[in-house]
Amino acid sequence: MDQYHQPAEEEDELTEMVCQETDLKDGQMKEVMVGEKKVLLVCSQGQYSAIGSQCSHYNAPLVKGTLVGQRVRCPFHGACFNVRTGDIEEYPGLDSLPTYKVKVENGMVYVTVNKHALKLTKRVKEMCSRIADIKHTILLIGGGPAALVCAETLRQTCYEGRIIMVTRDALPPFDKPKLSKALHLDRSSILLRSADFYQQYGIEVWTEKEVISVNTVNKAVKMIDGTWLNYDQLLIATGCRLKLKYHFRKSKKDFI
């Protein structure tokens, strides 16, 4: 092959030697640079693999996390990722990590990245959308991460029926911890997914709607406005709310 005419796939890739094969022992990981891209290199169960170096939740450096078997746990909030596939396996966080090719040759470890994906730090798992002719309906009561993860998991496992998420919040699922970290946040900065995302994957989000009763015999729920909604399967994921218990002091000797 002419050395000046490389295959298009090779032209789009960047490969660099990042370390010696003996630099990492089994169960160890380190950050390496491929071009200007930080990559997490992992040696697990006798095999090298490479994934994105930052958690898809709040961008924490995963090299400071914990590696157990084929899973690395984020040091900030405990999100877990598979070091072989990059898939997220435990919340918090919704997105998976990019993966990179690894080759061990003559005692050296090489990592290959796609030049067009150098700026990508996370990815969405492949999902299907809704087929209108399928009438089967799964109703999710609650607008938090649990309901959203359920909806996405259904689409990732090729469920093509109707998905309805009902929440009394004014917004679709959003990142509530951010509310305690800054004032005057822009609405779009706290949403877990955009409106386009829900439309693309056929996930209906009904905001400012409240379910007040469930009829499991007829498989229907009653809304606060008196309307009824039928379902085939139901998930209640409304979370919990702190209930404060007050103790009043009767005398100076009593404790509050």
Where are these regions (language model features)?
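Hydrophobic structural packing positions in well-ordered secondary structure
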Residues: 24, 55, 102, 151-154, ...
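N-terminal pre-ligand scaffold of iron-sulfur
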Residues: 1-69, 103-114
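Iron-sulfur (Fe-S) cluster-binding segments and ferredoxin-like electron-carrier domains
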Residues: 61-69, 80-92
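Beta1-alpha1 glycine-rich phosphate/pyrophosphate-binding loop at the start
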Residues: 133-204
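FAD-binding core/adjacent interface of flavoenzyme oxidoreductases
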Residues: 75, 84-108, 112-139, 191-256
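Short boundary motifs at domain starts and secondary-structure transition points
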Residues: 6-9, 127-132, 154
